C-alpha cells in the first residue's frame, strides 16, 4: 500500500526485537566533551587538561557549578532555619553548653570516677560517633520510647543537611554520614560497644544530625567541681552550626515527627498532619515547610480577596461565600451570561452608581448561610427604570432556583429611579434586543415582564461548551 494512510515500514531490523537492558551511564568529563575528548570523570578532575580553559562552553559549565553550589547552600540554610523555628524563643537566650568533644569526655568520665579525681584528670579524647551512637542505642533498648527509631530512620536527608553544616570540611561530613549509616545497618557495632550500662545515670547520646548531646542526670552532686557541669537539669543542650541552643526533653529530636508537628501546629487536625507527613516521606523538615508555605499562600489568598472585593456595611454575610471567589480572576470572563464581569465590584457607596453598578444593600441577613456565591445576572428588562428586578437576583444553589421564592423579598433594587442609562453604553450588552421565549414567573407586586438575552441564537452556533473559552461575538 502506497497511499498516505498506510503505515510506515522500517526495514532496518527485525520487528520483534527483544528489548535490551539499559546500561548504566558512566559519568564523563564535561570540559573534555566540549573539546571532543572522551574522559571518565572518576579521578580525572585534578588531571583534566582543560580545567583552566576559558572558552564559552567551559565558562557556562563554571556558571552551572556556581548555581548548583548556591542551591545547596540555600537548602542547608533553609534546613537550619526550620530547625531553629522548632525551638521556642524563651530557650534561645539561655547560656550555651561546652563544646561537644569536652562534653563527651566529661560525661564519659563522670560515671566512673569521683569528683575529686575528675578535677585532677586531663580531659579524655572525644569518642567516635559510632561509639556514641551505640551508647544511645543501648539506652533506647533499656528505655523503649514509642516511635523513636522510626523517627530517626525516616529523616536521612535532614541528617545529611545537619551533618554537612556542622562539620568544618566536606571530608568530616562524609565521615560522619558514613559512620552513622554503618551504625544503622550493622547491629554488630551496637553489640560490640558495651562499655556503657543501661543503668548509668549520665550518658552521652548522639542526636540525629550528629550533634554531641549531654543529658544532665538527676543527681546534682555528680560532678559539682567540674567546669563542664551545667545547672540546667531539664534541658537538652545542642551545639549547632548557627549557635548554641537549649531544648527541653519534650522537644528533643527522638520524639516522633507527628508529635513535633502537633506541638508546632496545634490548630491543624492530627489527620491532616499525618497525611502531610506521609506525603513528605516522613521528613519532618519538608512537612514543616509544606505547612508554612500553605499557611503563607492562604494568607496571600485572603489578602488578594480583600483587595479585590470591597464588601458592603453588612460584610459578615458575604465573607464566608465570596471570600474564596475573587472576582478579579481571569475565569470571570465576559463571555458567560451567568458571571459577573471584571468591571463590576461590590461597593459600600450606593450613591456612586455608574462606576460601581452592583451596590446591593440588604434589608436583613439570610435565613441560612448559602453554600455558593451570589451571582447577579446582567440582563435588561423592558422596564428601563430599574434594570435589576428582584427576580433577576437569584441564589444559585445545588438545585437551580431552589431558594428563589424565599429569598426574593430580601433584595431591593440596587439603583435609584433616575439611573436609566447604567448599561446602555456598556460594552458587555448588545444594542440589538430580541425577545427571549422564556417567560418570567409572576410574583406578588412585580409586573409580568419578558427578559432580553445578551446573545442571539446565531451567536451560540459553533461555540465551545467550556465556560472559560466562550468569547463574546461582537459582530452583531
From Swiss-Prot:
InterPro entries assigned to the protein according to its UniProt record, in alphabetical order: DM_DNA-bd, DM_DNA-bd_sf, DMA, DMRT, UBA-like_sf
Domain of life (superkingdom): Eukaryota
GO biological process: adult walking behavior; male sex differentiation; regulation of DNA-templated transcription; regulation of odontogenesis of dentin-containing tooth; transmission of nerve impulse; ventral spinal cord interneuron specification
SMART domains: DM (SM00301)
Region annotation (Disordered) ranges: 89-130, 147-195, 418-476
Additional detail: DMRT3 is a marker for a subset of spinal cord neurons (dI6).
Protein name: Doublesex- and mab-3-related transcription factor 3
Organism: Mus musculus
Gene: Dmrt3
Amino acid at each position: 500500500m502506497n497511499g498516505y494512510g498506510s503505515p510506515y515500514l522500517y526495514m532496518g531490523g527485525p520487528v520483534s526485537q527483544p528489548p535490551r537492558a539499559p546500561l548504566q551511564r558512566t559519568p564523563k568529563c564535561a570540559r573534555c566533551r566540549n573539546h571532543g575528548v572522551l574522559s571518565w570523570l572518576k579521578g580525572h578532575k585534578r588531571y583534566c587538561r582543560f580545567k583552566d580553559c576559558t572558552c564559552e562552553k567551559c565558562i557556562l559549565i563554571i556558571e552551572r557549578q556556581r548555581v548548583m553550589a548556591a542551591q545547596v547552600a540555600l537548602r542547608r540554610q533553609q534546613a537550619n532555619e526550620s530547625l531553629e523555628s522548632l525551638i521556642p524563643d524563651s530557650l534561645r537566650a539561655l547560656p550555651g553548653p561546652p563544646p561537644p568533644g569536652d562534653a563527651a569526655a566529661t560525661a564519659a568520665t563522670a560515671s566512673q570516677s569521683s569528683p575529686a579525681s575528675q578535677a585532677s584528670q586531663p580531659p579524655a579524647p572525644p569518642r567516635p560517633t559510632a561509639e556514641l551512637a551505640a551508647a544511645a542505642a543501648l539506652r533506647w533498648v533499656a528505655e523503649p520510647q514509642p516511635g523513636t527509631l522510626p523517627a530517626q530512620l525516616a529523616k536521612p536527608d535532614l541528617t545529611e543537611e545537619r551533618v554537612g553544616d556542622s562539620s568544618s570540611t566536606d571530608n568530616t561530613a562524609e565521615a560522619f554520614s558514613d559512620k552513622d549509616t554503618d551504625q544503622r545497618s550493622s547491629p554488630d557495632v551496637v553489640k560490640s560497644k558495651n562499655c556503657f550500662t543501661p543503668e548509668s545515670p549520665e550518658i552521652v547520646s548522639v542526636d540525629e544530625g550528629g550533634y554531641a548531646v549531654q543529658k544532665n542526670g538527676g543527681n546534682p552532686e555528680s560532678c559539682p567541681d567540674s567546669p563542664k557541669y551545667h545547672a540546667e537539669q531539664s534541658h537538652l543542650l545542642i551545639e549547632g552550626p548557627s549557635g548554641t541552643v537549649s531544648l527541653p526533653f519534650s522537644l528533643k529530636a527522638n520524639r516522633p515527627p507527628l508529635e513535633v508537628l502537633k506541638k508546632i501546629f496545634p490548630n491543624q487536625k492530627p489527620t491532616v498532619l499525618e497525611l502531610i507527613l506521609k506525603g513528605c516521606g516522613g521528613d519532618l523538615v519538608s512537612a514543616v515547610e509544606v505547612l508554612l508555605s500553605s499557611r503563607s499562600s492562604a494568607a496571600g489568598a485572603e489578602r488578594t480577596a480583600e483587595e479585590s472585593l470591597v464588601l458592603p456595611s453588612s460584610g459578615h454575610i458575604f465573607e464566608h461565600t465570596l471570600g474564596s471567589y475573587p472576582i478579579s480572576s481571569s475565569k470571570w470572563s465576559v463571555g458567560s451570561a451567568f458571571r459577573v464581569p471584571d468591571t463590576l465590584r461590590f461597593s459600600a457607596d450606593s450613591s456612586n452608581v455608574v462606576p460601581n453598578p452592583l451596590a446591593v444593600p440588604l434589608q436583613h441577613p439570610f435565613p441560612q448561610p448559602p453554600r455558593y456565591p451570589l451571582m447577579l445576572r446582567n440582563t435588561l428588562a423592558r422596564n428601563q427604570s430599574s434594570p435589576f428586578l428582584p427576580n433577576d437576583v437569584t441564589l444559585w444553589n445545588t438545585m437551580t432556583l431552589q431558594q428563589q421564592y424565599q429569598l426574593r423579598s430580601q433584595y431591593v433594587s440596587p439603583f435609584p429611579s433616575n439611573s436609566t442609562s447604567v448599561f446602555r453604553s456598556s460594552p458587555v450588552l448588545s444594542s440589538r434586543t430580541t425577545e427571549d421565549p422564556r417567560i418570567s414567573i409572576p410574583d406578588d407586586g412585580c409586573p409580568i415582564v419578558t427578559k432580553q438575552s445578551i446573545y442571539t441564537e446565531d451567536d451560540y452556533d459553533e461555540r465551545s461548551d467550556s465556560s472559560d473559552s466562550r468569547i463574546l461575538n461582537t459582530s452583531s
